[in-house]
């Protein structure tokens, strides 16, 4: 079983940001948790936002498709997308293999934090 990184923050919709304190103007990396990845099953495709586009906390920005279903992915913070993980185009399964590392989705320059929780609270909400 994959452990939640304790220095990340999490959304109720199972996304993470790679910081313990979201600061306006800071760039953070975003992904989905192992809990979401395990629930989805084998991920075969992911739709990511365009670089330069704006995402809004709590709003859907793309989809993840698995052998079981298609699900929306929600932005945990608002801001401008500055990079996307192009490796996912050829191997969306990286999300299953390494959700907190090589399976990241995009990087965003934060304009506003969404409602995020620490690892302990996220874990408790998903037991």
UniProtKB/Swiss-Prot annotation:
Signal peptide: none annotated. GO terms for cellular component: cytosol; glycine cleavage complex. Keywords: Lipoyl. Its cofactor is (R)-lipoate. Gene3D superfamilies: 2.40.50.100. One of its GO terms (biological process) is glycine decarboxylation via glycine cleavage system. Residues 27-109 form the Lipoyl-binding domain. The modification N6-lipoyllysine is found at residue 68. SUPFAM superfamilies: Single hybrid motif. InterPro entries: 2-oxoA_DH_lipoyl-BS (IPR003016), Biotin_lipoyl (IPR000089), GCV_H (IPR002930), GCV_H/Fam206 (IPR033753), GCV_H_sub (IPR017453), Single_hybrid_motif (IPR011053). Pfam families: GCV_H (PF01597). Binds 1 lipoyl cofactor covalently. The glycine cleavage system catalyzes the degradation of glycine. The H protein shuttles the methylamine group of glycine from the P protein to the T protein. The glycine cleavage system is composed of four proteins: P, T, L and H. Belongs to the GcvH family. This is Glycine cleavage system H protein. The lineage of its organism: Bacteria, Bacillati, Actinomycetota, Actinomycetes, Mycobacteriales.
